[in-house]
Regions:
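Conserved N-terminal segment of class I S-adenosyl-L-methionine
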Residues: 1-157, 166-172, 236-239, 260-276, ...
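Hydrophobic/aromatic residues located in beta-strands of well-ordered beta-sheets
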Residues: 115, 183-185
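Short catalytic micro-motifs in class I SAM-dependent methyltransferases
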Residues: 157-164, 186
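Conserved, well-ordered alpha-helix/loop/beta-strand core segments that scaffold catalytic motifs
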Residues: 172, 185-186
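Short glycine-dipeptide loop
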Residues: 177-183
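Feature marks short, surface-exposed loop/turn motifs that line or immediately flank catalytic pockets
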Residues: 180, 191-193, 241-243
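Short, glycine-/aromatic-enriched active-site segment of Class I SAM-dependent methyltransferases
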Residues: 186-216, 221-226, 250-252
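Substrate-binding/catalytic lobe of Class I Rossmann-like enzymes that use SAM or dcSAM, i.e.
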Residues: 220-255
């Protein structure tokens, strides 16, 4: 195994899972999930998302966000519907942590939620604010908790894989939630069975390991264990289209990135077809069952605070 002792004196140790770009990934016994060692300082990580994430790392993200809006809306509606079913109709306040351009806020506002967002990136926060949302342009720290106030739902979509201290994020989210409130988490579903198959057959490398952007690598189980360790009760799992299916059936977008846009278009068409048919429950059931099998591109969990 490998080990690293952080500035807080805690030792992260466990079996070495992989080494990519000179960075080790371990299955950490202390944390209960796979992460890189050494972990960067929280300040350095926060700085990256404040300044250059949307200009340098994802320069086309905001323009694609608009292009994908109708499709994203369908997926956000699915998530919000699940939350509404658990919460009941009177509880409709949410904060989206790392809200980016605010697409889930658009969906929530249209469904009658009172919503706000927190976003460290200036451009993305501005993009969301220009469309009428209440957005706090700051990283997630204890300093912003009072400003956000108590809510019924805290969502963090594709956030936890980026942060050096996911335990703190769950703890702060817990402080924002009323009793019975919900935590909605989405992270990449990494080292899943489809990915391992592609790698084992030599069709791809471990493309999902990106140690400079993704510090933490979760499965449905390790994500659920993380929330359980904070007293949350995992309620429901779901996922998104298993993109690896394309690579397993002759369209290897990993080895041939030029296939990527076409695959994305087709997965979008898949999700939208059920909408056009008035059968969106079929899509929801499909993704919930896939998640039960540990498959799908993302791991989404809705957990309840006692």
């Amino acid at each position: 195994g490998s080990a690293w002792t952080g500035p807080d004196g805690l030792t992260h140790a466990g079996p070495l899972i992989d080494t990519v770009d000179g960075v080790d990934l371990i299955s950490c016994e202390l944390c209960g999930f796979v992460h890189v060692i050494p972990l960067p300082e929280p300040e350095a990580a926060a700085e990256h998302y404040k300044s250059d994430y949307y200009t340098e790392t994802k320069p086309t993200y905001l323009s694609h966000a608009t292009e994908d809006a109708a499709w994203q809306r369908v997926l956000h509606n699915d998530l919000l519907l699940m939350a509404e079913t658990i919460l009941g109709s009177s509880q409709r306040t949410l904060v989206d942590i790392g809200c980016g351009p605010g697409l889930i806020l658009d969906a929530a506002a249209d469904r009658g939620w009172t919503c706000s967002g927190l976003e460290p990136s200036r451009q993305a926060a501005q993009f969301a604010a220009e469309r009428g949302h209440t957005v706090i342009n700051a990283p997630f720290t204890p300093d912003v908790l009072a400003e956000i106030g108590e809510v019924d739902l805290v969502s963090m979509i594709n956030v936890l894989e980026h942060v050096p201290h996911p335990f703190d994020f769950i703890d702060w989210a817990n402080q924002l939630l009323q009793p019975g409130g919900l935590l909605l988490l989405t992270v990449p579903n990494d080292f899943n069975g489809f990915q391992r198959t592609l790698r084992a057959t030599g069709a791809t490398d471990a493309w999902w390991i990106s140690p400079h952007h993704h510090l933490n690598y979760f499965s449905f189980e390790t994500l659920e264990n993380l929330v359980k360790s904070h007293g949350f009760e995992p309620f429901l799992r779901t996922t998104s289209y298993p993109m690896e299916l394309f690579a397993l059936t002759g369209r290897n977008y990993v080895a041939e990135p030029e296939q990527g846009r076409g695959c994305h278009k087709d997965r979008r068409a898949f999700d939208l077809a059920f909408e056009a048919a008035g059968l969106s429950h079929v899509r929801r059931t499909f993704y919930e069952r896939l998640a039960q099998a540990g498959l799908g591109r993302e791991a989404t969990n809705i957990a309840q605070k006692p």
